[in-house]
Amino acid sequence: MNRYGLHGKLQVTAGNGPQLAQILLEASRLVSTAKGCRLYLVSQEDTSPDEVWVTEVWDSKEDHDNSLQVPGVKELISQAMPLLAGRPEKGQELTVLGGAGLSNL
């Protein structure tokens, strides 16, 4: 069964990469038990720590969309928005076929 994937980069204002990464890691903890969450990774560029990447895998797009209703998630989004260097770009939406590290795919 295919899954819904989302992969995107967030560019933050100078020096705020670590702070945004911490906010996103907290978001990953909140959604880790949400229905359909298979993977929520937060990464930083080695050469540019103010570029933060998020990779998500969900059972469905609906599960991803519903994760925004998890208590605390909207508050974290509100904390993150002022750190961004502009409006976030739309991430890449992917059909995840499977692979190492994704159980039950």
Task: Name every feature range the model reports, one short phrase each.
Residues 4-11, 41-68:
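Short, well-ordered beta-strand segments in beta-rich or mixed alpha/beta enzyme
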Residues 2, 41-50, 76-105:
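Glycine-rich beta-strand-turn "strand-cap" elements at beta-sheet edges
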Residues 26-38, 57-92:
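An amphipathic, aromatic/His-enriched active-site/gating alpha helix that lines ligand/cofactor pockets
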Residues 2-4, 18, 35-36:
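Short, flexible segments with low predicted structural confidence
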